[in-house]
C-alpha cells in the first residue's frame, strides 16, 4: 500500500506559555500515549516519528480526528517488547501532530511539535494506552541572577563542546544562539548530548529549573572530557600515521641513494636475495622462484612496524632454512652398517636384513626413493631405538615425533598462513631441523592416531607416505611443492588392527616379536647392565651379575615381552647398591640369585597357577595381544539351567561364537544328549577384568568342555591354539611366535598348533624353538588323542574312533597289541618335525 499525501493540520508550534490563549485550556486532560525507545523527545523540538502499524497507528488516527495531542513516554526496558503501563516512565512530553503520512506497511509517519512536560496520574485505558495527566509548573529554584549565571555557564560550555565536536552542525549552533529561556536552553543542550536513557529521563522529570540546569552542566562536563580524550586519541593516531608515512618516504629515499651507490644495508633483505639466487642456481621449481620473488618484493615495501612485515619475514625464513639442494650421494659401506646395527641391538635379523637390502639397492642405483617401514611389536622390544640405529647405520640425521593421540590434520600438513601464529607441519619442521632431504623420520605410535573435528591425520599421512605423490608434497603453510621422496620414513605400532588398510598398503611391515629368556639374558649382558651402571654412576665399582641371577631377575621380577620392565627393576636394584656405596656399607661385587630378594623384595611372579590345567574342565590356550603373547586358562563347569552356555571373563563377539561352535561340536562328538540336558555350561576365562577376543581359542574351549563331559583332566604340559569349525577342522591362526614365547616363558614345552601354520613354525629361529615339542593338527580328533588317555578316548562314540584310524599318524594311532608310551610319542613327533624341516 502506498502512503497518502501529507495532510496539513493546525500548526501549534508557536504556542507559548505567555500566549493570549492559556496553555492549560488547550492541552487535554487525557492523552493517547505513544512509547518511545532509546532516548526521549524534549519540549520545544519539532521532530518526525514513525509509529508502527497496529494499535498505536490507530491511536494516531483517533488523535488526528480529535485535538491532535499525543503523549510521548520512554520505555523502561527495551528488551521487554510489552508496551504496558508497567514498562513506561511516569513523566513524558506532550506533542502536537503537525503533519501525517500513511506508509505502505500501514505504519504512520508523523511530524510533531513537543510542547511541555506532563505527569501520568492514572490510566483510563491500557489497550491502547490512554492516561489522565497533569502539567506541572516549572519552578525557578534559585534567584534570577543565579539562574542567569548558570545559563551563561551552560552556553559557554556548549560552545566549547561544539568547537571540539565535528558532529555539531551549523543549524544546531544557530539554534543554540537563538534560545533565550534557561529551561528551553537546558532541554536543547541535553537533547544533543550522548547520554544513557536513565540520565535523559532524569532531566525530563526535573521541574525545578536550577536542578535541571545543574544536571545538564554535569552531563555536559563529562561529554567535554570524553570529546577531549577522543581528540587526543585521534591526534595520536594521526601523528603515528604521519610518522609512518614520513619513515616510509625516508626509507624509499635511502634505498634509492643506496642503489645509486651500490650499497645494501638491510641484512634480512640481503639474506633473502642470496636465497633467491641460490634457488635460481639450483634450477628450482619455477613456482617456488616466482613465489619467493613475489614475497621478497612485498617484504621490501613492508613497514617493519606492521604485522605483515613479520608474517612475510617468518615465511621467507622458513623457506630459506629448508634443504632445497638435492640429497647428497653418500658412500655406503654395508659391513660398517651391519656392525652399527649389531652394536646396539641383539637379534632382530629381519629388520637388519631389510636395511642392508635397502643400502645395497641404494649403492647400485642412486635414484632409489625413500622407503617406508612399519615396525610392529609389543612395547619394550626396541622399535624406537632400532629406528635411531638405522639412521646411524645409513649416516643420516634422525627426527622422531609421536603421532599417538594426534587429532589435527594441520599437525602433519601445517596451518594456512591466514591464521595467526601459523606454522608448517611436522614433516617440513623435520626437514628444517635436520637440514637434509634424505633424513630418517620416525612416526611413533602410528596405530594410536585419532580423528577429530579438525580433520583426519591418517588421511593426511597418505600423501606423505605415498612414493608416487610425495615428490610434490604441499604443506599448507608453504603452499609450494617440496620433494620429500628421499626421506626414509619409519613408523612404529603395537598392533595393526587400528591402522587403515590404505595406509598399511603404503608401508612394508616388519614384525618384532617378544624376547625369550635366553635373548633377554644376552641383551642384559651386552647392553642393559652397562647402561644401568653408567646411568647410576656405579660403573667404576666393577659390579657384576651372575647368569643364574639374571634368569631369576627376568622370570621372577619382569615377566614381559620386551625389556623395558627389566631395565626398571635393574635400575631399582642398582640404586639400592648406590645407597650402600654412599653410606660406605658393604655390598656384593657379584649379584647372586639370593641377593635379589634383599634388594628387590618378594618376587612378583612365581610359577603361574593359571597355566596348570589340573582339574577336569580346564585347558590351557595360547593368545596373542598387542603387548605380546600370553597364556589363557579356560575353565568349564556344569551349572543348573536349561542348556546352552554362559560366558564370563569379558569375552568378545568372536570368542562367544567360538564357544558356541565348540559346544555344538562336543555335543555331536559325544552323542550323549543326557549329559547336557537340564544343565548349562559356565565357561570362564580369567582374568575377568581384561577384555579378550579372537578366533584361536576354539580347540582350547572344546578341550575344556570335553574334559568336563568326560570328567577327566587333560594331560599336563600342553598349550594349544587353533580355530575350530563345526566339522572338527582346525584352521590357521596368527601370532604363532609370540604364543610360543609366552608358553616357553611359563614353562609350557608342548605346543599343539594348526598344521596350516607349519610354514610359520619353520620361519621361527631354532633358538626360540629349542627345548620345545610341536604337534601340528588338522582335525580335533588329533587334539583329543594328544590330551586324553586311550581309555578315555574309547568312551567317545564309534564314529570318532573310526576317524582316528584314518587321520592320526601311525606312530601315534591306537593299537591294543602295541602300546606306545607318552615319552616315545613325544620323541617320535619331535623327530618327525625335524625331518620335515630338513626336507
From Swiss-Prot:
GO aspect biological process, one term: cellular response to heat
Residue ranges, compositional bias (Low complexity): 823-832
Location of this chain's protein in the cell: Cytoplasm
Region entry Disordered, spans: 807-839
GO molecular function, one term: ATP binding
Reaction(s) this enzyme catalyzes, per UniProt: Hydrolysis of proteins in presence of ATP
Gene3D superfamilies: 1.10.8.60, 1.20.5.5270, 1.20.58.1480, 3.30.230.10, LON domain-like (2.30.130.40), P-loop containing nucleotide triphosphate hydrolases (3.40.50.300)
Keywords: ATP-binding, Cytoplasm, Hydrolase, Nucleotide-binding, Protease, Serine protease, Stress response
Binding site for ATP: 377-384
Ranges for domain Lon N-terminal: 31-224
Induction: By heat shock.
Database matches in InterPro entries: AAA+_ATPase, ATPase_AAA_core, Lon_bac, Lon_bac/euk-typ, Lon_lid, Lon_proteolytic, Lon_Prtase, Lon_prtase_N
UniProt-listed Enzyme Commission number(s): 3.4.21.53
GO terms for cellular component: cytoplasm
The Lon proteolytic domain, residue ranges: 613-790
Residues at the catalytic site: 696, 739
SUPFAM superfamilies per UniProt: P-loop containing nucleoside triphosphate hydrolases (SSF52540), PUA domain-like (SSF88697), Ribosomal protein S5 domain 2-like (SSF54211)
A Pfam family recorded for this sequence: Lon_C
Assembly behavior: Homohexamer. Organized in a ring with a central cavity.
Family, per entry: Belongs to the peptidase S16 family.
PANTHER family on file: LON PROTEASE, LON PROTEASE HOMOLOG, MITOCHONDRIAL
Functional summary from the UniProt entry: ATP-dependent serine protease that mediates the selective degradation of mutant and abnormal proteins as well as certain short-lived regulatory proteins. Required for cellular homeostasis and for survival from DNA damage and developmental changes induced by stress. Degrades polypeptides processively to yield small peptide fragments that are 5 to 10 amino acids long. Binds to DNA in a double-stranded, site-specific manner.
Record's protein name: Lon protease
Encoding gene (name): lon
